[in-house]
Protein backbone atom coordinates (compact mmCIF):
# COMPACT_ATOMS: atom_id res chain seq x y z
CA UNK A 1 0.00 0.00 0.00
CA UNK A 2 1.34 3.41 -0.85
CA UNK A 3 2.12 5.97 1.83
CA UNK A 4 -0.81 8.16 0.79
CA UNK A 5 -3.31 5.28 1.01
CA UNK A 6 -4.54 6.03 -2.51
CA UNK A 7 -3.20 2.98 -4.33
CA UNK A 8 -0.86 0.02 -4.45
CA UNK A 9 2.78 0.47 -5.33
CA UNK A 10 4.18 -1.81 -8.05
CA UNK A 11 7.63 -0.25 -7.94
CA UNK A 12 9.24 3.15 -8.15
CA UNK A 13 6.81 5.69 -9.56
CA UNK A 14 4.17 3.06 -10.41
CA UNK A 15 0.86 2.94 -8.54
CA UNK A 16 -2.45 1.24 -9.20
CA UNK A 17 -5.69 2.56 -7.75
CA UNK A 18 -7.73 -0.04 -5.79
CA UNK A 19 -10.72 0.47 -8.10
CA UNK A 20 -8.57 -0.74 -11.01
CA UNK A 21 -7.78 -4.05 -9.30
CA UNK A 22 -10.35 -6.71 -10.13
CA UNK A 23 -10.51 -10.26 -8.82
CA UNK A 24 -9.98 -12.71 -11.71
CA UNK A 25 -9.91 -9.60 -13.93
CA UNK A 26 -13.70 -9.22 -13.46
CA UNK A 27 -14.96 -8.47 -9.96
CA UNK A 28 -14.38 -5.13 -8.25
CA UNK A 29 -13.50 -4.95 -4.56
CA UNK A 30 -14.92 -1.43 -4.30
CA UNK A 31 -18.14 -1.25 -2.28
CA UNK A 32 -17.77 -4.70 -0.72
CA UNK A 33 -18.39 -4.37 3.00
CA UNK A 34 -18.62 -6.49 6.13
CA UNK A 35 -21.71 -5.60 8.15
CA UNK A 36 -20.80 -7.66 11.23
CA UNK A 37 -18.39 -5.48 13.29
CA UNK A 38 -16.83 -8.48 15.03
CA UNK A 39 -15.78 -10.07 11.71
CA UNK A 40 -14.33 -7.00 9.97
CA UNK A 41 -10.81 -7.62 11.21
CA UNK A 42 -10.85 -11.26 10.08
CA UNK A 43 -12.35 -10.97 6.59
CA UNK A 44 -9.54 -9.60 4.42
CA UNK A 45 -10.90 -7.56 1.51
CA UNK A 46 -7.60 -6.08 0.36
CA UNK A 47 -7.85 -5.85 -3.46
CA UNK A 48 -5.91 -8.55 -5.33
CA UNK A 49 -5.94 -9.79 -8.91
CA UNK A 50 -4.93 -13.35 -8.07
CA UNK A 51 -5.84 -14.79 -4.64
CA UNK A 52 -2.65 -16.75 -3.96
CA UNK A 53 -0.25 -15.86 -1.13
CA UNK A 54 1.85 -19.02 -1.27
CA UNK A 55 1.40 -19.84 2.43
CA UNK A 56 3.39 -16.82 3.65
CA UNK A 57 1.10 -16.57 6.68
CA UNK A 58 1.67 -20.13 7.84
CA UNK A 59 4.19 -19.54 10.64
CA UNK A 60 2.60 -16.37 12.05
CA UNK A 61 -0.05 -16.55 14.72
CA UNK A 62 -3.39 -15.31 13.37
CA UNK A 63 -1.61 -14.73 10.06
CA UNK A 64 -4.53 -16.26 8.17
CA UNK A 65 -6.51 -13.10 8.92
CA UNK A 66 -4.25 -11.40 6.35
CA UNK A 67 -5.06 -13.94 3.62
CA UNK A 68 -7.65 -12.76 1.04
CA UNK A 69 -11.02 -14.23 1.97
CA UNK A 70 -11.46 -15.71 -1.52
CA UNK A 71 -8.18 -17.60 -1.16
CA UNK A 72 -9.30 -18.94 2.21
CA UNK A 73 -12.39 -20.38 0.53
CA UNK A 74 -10.13 -22.03 -2.07
CA UNK A 75 -7.99 -23.51 0.69
CA UNK A 76 -11.06 -25.03 2.34
CA UNK A 77 -11.98 -26.68 -0.96
CA UNK A 78 -8.60 -28.46 -1.06
CA UNK A 79 -9.92 -31.17 1.24
CA UNK A 80 -10.07 -34.10 1.96
CA UNK A 81 -6.65 -35.58 1.22
CA UNK A 82 -7.28 -36.44 -2.42
CA UNK A 83 -7.75 -32.74 -3.17
CA UNK A 84 -4.76 -31.63 -1.11
CA UNK A 85 -2.47 -29.24 -2.94
CA UNK A 86 -4.71 -28.92 -5.99
CA UNK A 87 -4.84 -25.14 -5.79
CA UNK A 88 -5.43 -24.65 -9.51
CA UNK A 89 -8.45 -26.96 -9.36
CA UNK A 90 -9.86 -24.98 -6.41
CA UNK A 91 -9.07 -21.72 -8.25
CA UNK A 92 -11.09 -22.81 -11.29
CA UNK A 93 -13.99 -24.01 -9.13
CA UNK A 94 -14.30 -20.66 -7.34
CA UNK A 95 -13.79 -18.64 -10.53
CA UNK A 96 -16.59 -20.51 -12.34
CA UNK A 97 -18.86 -20.42 -9.27
CA UNK A 98 -18.48 -16.62 -9.11
CA UNK A 99 -19.56 -16.35 -12.76
CA UNK A 100 -22.65 -18.46 -12.00
CA UNK A 101 -23.48 -16.31 -8.96
CA UNK A 102 -23.37 -13.14 -11.05
CA UNK A 103 -25.55 -14.64 -13.81
CA UNK A 104 -28.16 -15.82 -11.27
CA UNK A 105 -28.24 -12.83 -8.91
CA UNK A 106 -26.67 -9.88 -10.75
CA UNK A 107 -24.70 -9.11 -7.57
CA UNK A 108 -20.97 -8.84 -6.99
CA UNK A 109 -19.91 -12.43 -6.07
CA UNK A 110 -17.40 -11.12 -3.50
CA UNK A 111 -20.22 -9.41 -1.61
CA UNK A 112 -22.32 -12.59 -1.84
CA UNK A 113 -19.42 -14.55 -0.31
CA UNK A 114 -19.09 -12.04 2.55
CA UNK A 115 -22.85 -12.20 3.27
CA UNK A 116 -22.72 -16.00 3.21
CA UNK A 117 -19.89 -16.02 5.76
CA UNK A 118 -21.70 -13.56 8.04
CA UNK A 119 -24.90 -15.63 7.96
CA UNK A 120 -23.12 -19.00 8.39
CA UNK A 121 -20.82 -18.04 11.26
CA UNK A 122 -22.05 -19.55 14.56
CA UNK A 123 -22.11 -17.17 17.51
CA UNK A 124 -22.35 -19.81 20.23
CA UNK A 125 -20.88 -23.29 20.64
CA UNK A 126 -20.33 -25.81 23.42
CA UNK A 127 -17.19 -26.96 25.20
CA UNK A 128 -16.47 -29.63 27.80
CA UNK A 129 -15.56 -28.82 31.39
CA UNK A 130 -14.90 -31.32 34.18
CA UNK A 131 -15.93 -30.89 37.82
CA UNK A 132 -15.09 -33.64 40.29
CA UNK A 133 -14.58 -36.22 37.58
CA UNK A 134 -17.88 -35.43 35.87
CA UNK A 135 -17.82 -33.87 32.40
CA UNK A 136 -20.37 -31.22 31.45
CA UNK A 137 -21.07 -29.38 28.21
CA UNK A 138 -21.43 -25.64 28.60
CA UNK A 139 -22.27 -22.87 26.17
CA UNK A 140 -19.50 -20.45 25.16
CA UNK A 141 -19.17 -17.51 22.80
CA UNK A 142 -17.24 -18.25 19.61
CA UNK A 143 -14.14 -16.17 18.82
CA UNK A 144 -14.44 -14.10 15.60
CA UNK A 145 -11.54 -15.94 13.93
CA UNK A 146 -13.17 -19.30 14.59
CA UNK A 147 -16.53 -17.98 13.37
CA UNK A 148 -14.98 -17.23 9.97
CA UNK A 149 -13.17 -20.60 9.94
CA UNK A 150 -16.37 -22.48 10.73
CA UNK A 151 -18.42 -20.59 8.14
CA UNK A 152 -15.91 -21.32 5.36
CA UNK A 153 -15.75 -24.98 6.40
CA UNK A 154 -19.55 -25.34 6.32
CA UNK A 155 -19.79 -23.69 2.89
CA UNK A 156 -17.07 -25.93 1.42
CA UNK A 157 -18.56 -29.05 3.03
CA UNK A 158 -22.01 -28.18 1.70
CA UNK A 159 -20.72 -27.79 -1.86
CA UNK A 160 -18.75 -31.04 -1.60
CA UNK A 161 -21.73 -33.03 -0.27
CA UNK A 162 -24.00 -31.61 -2.96
CA UNK A 163 -21.62 -32.69 -5.73
CA UNK A 164 -20.96 -36.19 -4.33
CA UNK A 165 -22.70 -38.89 -6.42
CA UNK A 166 -24.50 -36.11 -8.27
CA UNK A 167 -24.27 -35.16 -11.95
CA UNK A 168 -24.35 -31.48 -10.89
CA UNK A 169 -20.76 -30.13 -11.01
CA UNK A 170 -19.20 -28.76 -7.84
CA UNK A 171 -19.01 -25.27 -9.38
CA UNK A 172 -22.82 -25.11 -9.52
CA UNK A 173 -23.09 -26.61 -6.05
CA UNK A 174 -20.73 -24.01 -4.59
CA UNK A 175 -22.59 -21.16 -6.31
CA UNK A 176 -25.93 -22.46 -5.02
CA UNK A 177 -24.57 -22.90 -1.49
CA UNK A 178 -23.19 -19.34 -1.43
CA UNK A 179 -26.41 -17.82 -2.78
CA UNK A 180 -28.62 -19.70 -0.29
CA UNK A 181 -26.30 -18.91 2.64
CA UNK A 182 -26.17 -15.22 1.68
CA UNK A 183 -29.98 -15.17 1.82
CA UNK A 184 -30.08 -17.04 5.14
CA UNK A 185 -32.08 -19.81 3.45
CA UNK A 186 -32.37 -22.98 5.62
CA UNK A 187 -31.89 -25.09 2.49
CA UNK A 188 -28.23 -24.11 2.76
CA UNK A 189 -26.06 -26.76 4.45
CA UNK A 190 -24.00 -24.02 6.12
CA UNK A 191 -27.08 -22.34 7.59
CA UNK A 192 -28.41 -25.66 8.91
CA UNK A 193 -25.08 -26.47 10.55
CA UNK A 194 -24.91 -23.05 12.19
CA UNK A 195 -28.45 -23.32 13.53
CA UNK A 196 -27.81 -26.83 14.88
CA UNK A 197 -24.68 -25.69 16.74
CA UNK A 198 -26.49 -22.70 18.22
CA UNK A 199 -29.49 -24.87 19.19
CA UNK A 200 -27.24 -27.28 21.12
CA UNK A 201 -25.43 -24.34 22.75
CA UNK A 202 -28.75 -22.80 23.81
CA UNK A 203 -29.82 -26.05 25.50
CA UNK A 204 -26.47 -26.19 27.35
CA UNK A 205 -26.75 -22.77 28.99
Curated annotation (Swiss-Prot):
Gene Ontology process terms (BP): translation
HAMAP family reported in the protein's UniProt record: Ribosomal_uS7_A
Keyword set includes Transmembrane helix: no
Subunit note: Part of the 30S ribosomal subunit.
Protein name, per record: Small ribosomal subunit protein uS7
CDD domains linked to this entry: uS7_Eukaryote (cd14867)
GO cellular component terms, semicolon-separated: small ribosomal subunit
Alphabetized InterPro entries for the sequence: Ribosomal_uS7, Ribosomal_uS7_arc, Ribosomal_uS7_CS, Ribosomal_uS7_dom, Ribosomal_uS7_dom_sf, Ribosomal_uS7_euk/arc
GO molecular function terms attached to this record: rRNA binding; structural constituent of ribosome
Keyword terms of this UniProt record: Ribonucleoprotein, Ribosomal protein, RNA-binding, rRNA-binding
Purpose of the protein: One of the primary rRNA binding proteins, it binds directly to 16S rRNA where it nucleates assembly of the head domain of the 30S subunit. Is located at the subunit interface close to the decoding center.
Family label: Belongs to the universal ribosomal protein uS7 family.
Upper taxonomic lineage: Archaea, Thermoproteota, Thermoprotei, Desulfurococcales, Desulfurococcaceae
